[in-house]
Amino acid sequence: MADISTKTSLQPSTRTTDILSYSHDASHYLLKPKAIYTPETKEQLAEIFALATELGIGVTFRSGGTSLSGQATSDGFLVDTRKNFRGIKVGSQGVQVSVSPGATVRAVNTSLARFKRKLGPDPASEVACTIGGVVANNSSGMCCGTEQNSYRTIASLVLVLPNGLVIDTGASDADEILQQKSPSIHAGLIALR
């Protein structure tokens, strides 16, 4: 593989100890990532996507690593979102909350507790699992069923697409921006409907 250490503004880890520690999640799978990235910004994430596209390498996101199905392991680039994307902003008297993918369910529920509220999804691993994984897997838990799962409780998302475009699905012009700047992604999403 080409030297990737100078290809982005973010230095990846390829240390053997890091590779081995990220080779496992809560599942029985063992996949050794080529590199581990811990971006701090959406722009750095876009750089990782660009490099992965250039090299034909897959990108896997990891936060809590609590899935029993192996979604948090990869033999490509592994992006750790737990270290730098932990933001929680409670608004509207706890009716809405804006959360970054690395925040744990427990941290979010602790922030909402003063309003006597909590998230809909209630996975058993709430102390370690993160919002990124909960949303990606549409996690629910024992109590929320299908009425309060992730998909039913999300108002909007801010996404960094593989082509580097950052899109806020809550913006009134999100559909037009996506159609204009990423027509193939837009067409693919329309085809899924």
For each of these PLM feature ranges, what is it?
Residues M1-E54, G64-V95, A124, E147:
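N-terminal flexible segment immediately upstream of the FAD-binding catalytic core
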Residues I88-G91, S100-P101, V105-R193:
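FAD-binding subdomain of flavoenzyme oxidoreductases
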Residues I57-G58, K118:
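Residue-level detector of anion-binding/catalytic polar loops
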Residues T60-R62:
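Solvent-exposed beta-strand sheet faces enriched in polar/charged residues
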